[in-house]
Amino acid sequence: MEFITGRHIPRRTFLRGMGATVALPFLDAMIPAGRVWSRIADDALPTRLVAIEMVHGAAGCNEWGATQNLWSPEAVGRDFDLAPTSLSSLEPFRDYLTIISNTDVRMAEAYQPYEIGGDHFRSSAVFLTQSHPKQTEGSDVYVGTSLDQLYAQRFGQDTPIPSMQLCIENINQSGGCAYGYTCVYTDSISWASPTEPLPVIRDPRVAFDQLFGAGGTVEERVLRRRTNKSILDWITGRVAQLRRELGPNDIQRLDRYLDNVREIERRIQRTEAQNTSGESRELPEAPAGVPDSFEEHTRMMFDLQVLAFSSDVTRVFSLKMGRDSSARVFHESGSDRPFHPASHHGAREEAILDFAKINRYHVSMLPYFLEKLQGIQEGDTHLLDKTMIIYGSPMGDPNLHNHRRAPLFVAGGANGRLEGGLHLNTPDGTPMANAMLSLAHALGMDDMDSFGDSTAELSLSMPASTLTSTGS
């Protein structure tokens, strides 16, 4: 517990320059003298939320894959072994991990004969809404309000950006896809209302400029970009002035934050230079700011989220990790098959194991993010303690296009609302919406009585003795 003394500066202090607006991290100087750091920080900054969709299910959701614990561990409760699972890379963060196995996403299923075959084109819209999309190829879309947007509407309205939506692969939010469904359903996981899908950002440069480059006029922003100078070069005078007003701890915190801003900016600039050099690209259709490397692209997006959370520019992110129909090859995973063909494993054990390599590789991106959050101090603790990260898929076995035993886990402390270090295996037929309802309550939306097709709240601290003993 630390009491603050000295000069007070407003929480919403920005460093402004030509075509630049840089928010500040939470500093001691932002707390009125005589107040307690931890109490103010907890009151001022609600839980940060990240919702990540892994597309097209998991190898461990196949019946044979479940017996091999290819997705989640065999043991329930706290004494689980992650080694054989796709979550093995999360072992260093097991105390922040809540695995929720055996839930179904029934709203992604076909409800009418004419909807059969449209699983690819419904699923993403269902993940965070747990609602059944209206079949249409036009603009009269209808599904539900997503969990991230319900949270943003309640806890994100006093931040400069209520929420941001990111993606890794190319999307096309226009026209019809197939089986009578518009591509908007395929491409959107965040819905501000049942009829309002939110656009997503693939290019780290665009995301960076939204977070830090929104100041000044359009002409000033264009000029800043043309100079190829750092965004920080336009605020050096204001930084120097602010440093004279801060104590040693705040100066160190400010310098580290600005160093992180500059570091991600340099990486984006290097990527743009590489991708406009005339050399051939693995992703020729991608914007110049998008790395050809899946890992580097994902890390850039995670780093931008950490910066946004530390400066409270936004408290809510969603991230779509890919597309169901992706033909991308993830060589680093150890599989040389394109994603979508690999997912259709034909129930062959060797092919199921091959797809599990891709699942494991995708999950292995997350520890980088968790470590970065853990490295940002805020009050008496760090950002990982104050963040909830939902990671899952609305698809179960991709080979069958079913939505049973869908993969889902949660990472982070959620401001003390999640115990962590726990594997829950729900009874057969439990809707994923039950888990989402409980997560909404953990986020502070305690007055929500239902969500999607939920039937009850799911206890996130269920005693291991009351659970079954089969993983998935």
How should each PLM-predicted stretch be described?
Residues 1-472:
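Ligand-binding pockets and gating/stacking loops
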